[in-house]
């Protein structure tokens, strides 16, 4: 997964 790992609340965390 990429989005879940890099984007938690719509922000690159």
Curated annotation (Swiss-Prot):
UniProt-listed InterPro entries: Mcrtin_ACTH_cent
Signal peptide: none
Valine amide modifications at: 13
GO cellular component, one term: extracellular region
Secreted listed as a keyword: yes
GO molecular function list: hormone activity
Phosphoprotein among keywords: no
Compartments it resides in: Secreted
Source organism superkingdom: Eukaryota
Keywords for the protein's UniProt record, in alphabetical order: Amidation, Hormone, Secreted
Family listed: Belongs to the POMC family.
Name of the featured protein: Melanotropin alpha
